[in-house]
């Protein structure tokens, strides 16, 4: 499969780590969220408890770091591969220490390659939720 969305559309329903092969890219392991808002989301950053240092150098962000079962950054090269060949929606979920949950969705999310310093492109805020 090319993406978590493709896995979801083909009957995979469990959250977890999967191997995908995005168009024109090498196979990568990703964490797929198959339960949030219909499922099929690729998680590219997760912060839980501060167990992983995110104050790292450019090369670490380029290649990715951490552990998909805990805190991690998937890697800028992988993000470019995931967003380069087709439209991708971005959803950002946040939860504070009191359990207050917020999210925002963008209809278009792109990450440029390393030559363009992984420039982020966002368009079209689709939905926002802030719970009291």
Regions found by a protein language model. Give the residues of each.
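Extracellular beta-rich globular recognition domains, centered on the fibrinogen C-terminal
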Residues: 1-132
